[in-house]
Structure formats: structure tokens, C-alpha cells
């Protein structure tokens, strides 16, 4: 099958060609290995940048006949990742049994990257000479990513290159969500919104949902990356983005974003997002409002309630019947403070209705901001 010219780039990934029923029945006497779990980590923020060493731990399950003298080797199909330790002498795996190497995983290193969010393919090959058996599996690894993971205190979250937090896009392609300790993510979507009302025209620049799918107003200028700490923080990152590629909602902004997190006692349960906004358009902006949109899912989303503590300048969401777990956003600046809780029901209980035909429109977003 791989002798065909246009199949060569897919070598090892297309199966074995035409269905051979006789061979399929004979294969019942063969082992049948599958990767049932794996862990990629650098034991830090799991952002694999140039020069970083990371590990790959694999769990294998054998569904059919026992396999003996099993050897496993991983190889990188890209010159951007080097295999530091890629051999695992497994031995035998009986029928309906599993083995893993999480305590002694494979070791890899990122040696180079030509671009951000570069995909690297690592091939795992398992073979047994006594069983005349070979199994291959391919791992896709994102190196030099265009986002940062914050993982230095009880909060685990991700900040993107273009104004989102929790995940890097609406589809949750990459990201930790927003987790507290060992709890699952409490956030479905989160991002920065900047709006203004000038000359009877309302504009809001953002990257969150809209009536079609999501807005694409912010684009990276300097891709966010982790930096050396400047004070007593445990994590610091910096990046910038603009709205110059927006269509109807281009305002003319450059936004510098900073991310800080601390692990000192009493400061383990929050992350700081700081935005410095510059107007480089040729006009003064009036009615400017800046805020964070967050679709919280605390424990049971169907029981979520929202409230505001004006004295503390924060809005928060909690789940009825659950104690202790509360998601909060607090404004740290001295600017005018405002919160808006959107009712997650058809009609919006008379407020902003994100379920109508137009969805979460620019006017809805500006209403929520102001």
C-alpha cells in the first residue's frame, strides 16, 4: 500500500490495505496491544519550549494472546525533538493485562522550532520476536505553543496569545480550563472584551462567542510567553495583541497582557490578569469599557447562581447546595466597577438573551460591559 507514491507520507498510518478475512481470523492467536493511557509532562507547566526536556509515560493493554520478550522504542519523526531515552524492555504482558512505565518514562527534548504551535509526531514501536508481532502508535505533540499554562499554586489555568483565558479557543482545543486543586474545570469559556460608544457607533473587540460562532477581533503582536520573575511572584508571563485585523469592530488598540501568580500562604487561590490598553487610532475614544467575560460551570452548572460584592469589587458564581467552591473575578484597578450576570435561559429573564437568533451580539456585549 505504501508503494503508491501519494501514500508514502502516510507510512504506518493506513492499515494494511485490502481486508483479508482469513488473516483476520488467524490473528486471534496473536497479541493485540493498544495504548490505553499516556502522560506527557515536564513536571512544571507542560509547555514544551526550545531546550525543555519532557517525559512520555505510556500504558499498554493486551487484549488477546500473551506476548513475551516485548521491546518498545520511540522515535521522533521531526528533527525538532530529540529522543534522550527511548527504550523500554517490557518483557511479557499476559492476556487481558496491562503494563505502564509512568515511574520510568521515556525522555525527550525540544531542540528547535521554526514556528509557534508546531506539531511533532513521535512514533512508538512495540515488537516481539517470539510472537512475530509488531505494533505501532503515533503521538502528536505541540511544541513551542502560543499560550502559557499557570500551574504554580492551587489554581490551574491557561492564557492565550489573543485575550482568552481557560482555553485557547471556543472549541477548547488547548488549555487547562480553570481548575482549583483536584477539581475539574469550572470554566467553559473566558476572555477579554473592550468596547466603546463613539459617534453613536458601538464597537466591542473580543474573541468570545457571537451569533455565528466566535469573534476574531484580537490577533497576537508579541506571542505570550513565560518570563523570568521580577519580584515575589512564582509565575510571570507577558505578551501583546491588537485588534487591527477586526472587521466591523476594529477600534485601533494595542493590548499588553501580563499574567502573575503567587504561591505564598494566603495567595494560592488566584491568578492575576493585567491588561494595559493603548489607543493608537486617530481619534479620541468615548464610552470605553473593559471587562472579562466568563461562562462559569461550578460543580453543577444547572444550579449555578451569580452575585456581586460591590464593596470588594467582585462578581462571583456558586452552585446551590455546594459549600466552599466559588468562582470569582475581582477588579483590582480604581476604575468604575460593574458586573452583569447573564441568565442562562431562553429569553434571558428580560436581560441579555444569548439564545436568541442573533446570539451574543456586539450590543449585548456592550450592555454587559456597561
Tell where the protein language model's regions lie, with residue ranges.
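Solvent-exposed N-terminal domain segments of exported/luminal and surface proteins
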Residues: 141-226
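Terminal connector regions
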Residues: 102-149
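Asparagine-centered strand-capping/turn motif at beta-strand->loop junctions
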Residues: 59-64, 76, 110, 277-281
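Extended, loop-rich substrate-binding clefts of extracytoplasmic carbohydrate-active enzymes
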Residues: 198-274
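Short acidic, flexible loop segments centered on an aromatic residue
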Residues: 61-81, 86, 288-297
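Intrinsically disordered, low-complexity Pro/Gly/Ser/Thr-rich segments with frequent PxxP/GP/PP motifs
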Residues: 82-114
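C-terminal subdomain of the subtilisin-like protease fold in secreted/lumenal serine endopeptidases
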Residues: 1-53
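Glycine-rich (often Gly-Gly/Gly-Pro-rich) flexible segments and glycine-rich loop motifs
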Residues: 286-370
Amino acid at each position: 500500500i505504501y508503494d503508491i507514491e501519494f501514500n508514502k507520507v502516510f507510512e504506518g498510518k493506513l492499515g494494511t490495505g485490502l481486508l483479508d478475512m482469513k488473516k483476520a481470523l488467524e490473528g486471534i492467536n496473536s497479541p493485540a496491544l493498544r495504548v490505553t493511557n499516556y502522560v506527557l509532562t515536564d513536571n512544571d507547566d507542560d509547555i514544551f519550549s526550545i531546550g525543555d526536556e519532557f517525559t512520555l509515560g505510556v500504558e499498554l493493554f493486551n487484549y488477546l494472546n500473551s506476548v513475551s520478550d516485548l521491546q518498545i522504542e520511540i522515535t521522533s519523526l521531526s528533527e525538532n525533538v530529540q529522543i534522550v531515552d527511548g527504550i523500554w524492555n517490557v518483557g511479557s504482558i499476559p492476556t487481558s493485562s496491562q503494563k505502564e512505565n509512568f515511574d520510568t518514562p521515556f525522555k525527550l527534548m525540544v531542540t528547535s522550532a521554526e514556528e509557534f504551535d508546531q506539531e511533532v509526531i513521535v512514533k512508538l514501536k512495540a515488537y516481539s520476536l517470539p510472537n512475530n508481532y509488531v505494533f505501532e502508535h503515533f503521538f502528536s505533540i505541540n511544541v513551542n505553543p502560543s499560550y502559557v499554562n499557570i500551574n504554580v499554586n492551587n489554581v490551574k489555568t491557561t492564557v492565550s496569545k489573543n485575550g482568552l483565558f481557560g482555553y485557547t479557543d471556543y472549541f477548547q482545543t488547548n488549555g487547562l480550563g480553570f481548575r482549583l486543586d483536584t477539581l475539574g474545570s469550572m470554566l467553559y469559556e473566558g476572555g477579554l472584551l473592550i468596547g466603546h460608544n463613539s459617534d453613536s457607533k458601538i464597537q466591542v473587540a473580543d474573541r468570545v462567542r457571537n451569533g455565528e460562532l466566535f469573534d476574531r477581533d484580537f490577533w497576537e503582536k508579541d506571542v505570550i510567553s513565560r518570563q523570568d520573575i521580577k519580584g515575589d511572584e512564582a509565575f510571570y508571563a507577558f505578551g501583546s495583541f491588537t485588534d487591527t485585523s477586526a472587521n466591523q469592530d476594529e477600534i485601533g488598540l494595542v493590548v499588553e497582557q501580563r499574567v502573575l501568580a503567587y504561591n505564598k500562604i494566603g495567595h494560592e487561590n488566584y491568578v492575576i490578569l493585567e491588561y494595559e490598553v493603548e489607543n493608537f487610532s486617530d481619534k479620541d475614544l468615548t464610552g470605553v469599557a473593559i471587562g472579562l467575560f466568563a461562562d462559569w460551570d461550578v460543580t453543577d452548572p444547572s444550579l449555578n447562581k451569580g452575585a456581586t460584592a460591590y464593596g470588594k469589587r467582585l462578581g462571583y458564581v456558586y452552585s446551590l447546595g455546594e459549600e466552599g467552591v466559588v468562582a470569582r473575578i475581582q477588579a483590582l484597578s480604581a476604575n468604575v466597577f460593574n458586573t452583569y450576570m447573564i441568565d442562562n435561559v431562553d429569553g434571558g429573564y428580560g436581560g441579555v438573551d444569548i439564545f436568541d437568533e442573533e446570539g451574543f451580539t456586539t450590543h449585548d456585549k456592550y450592555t454587559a460591559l456597561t
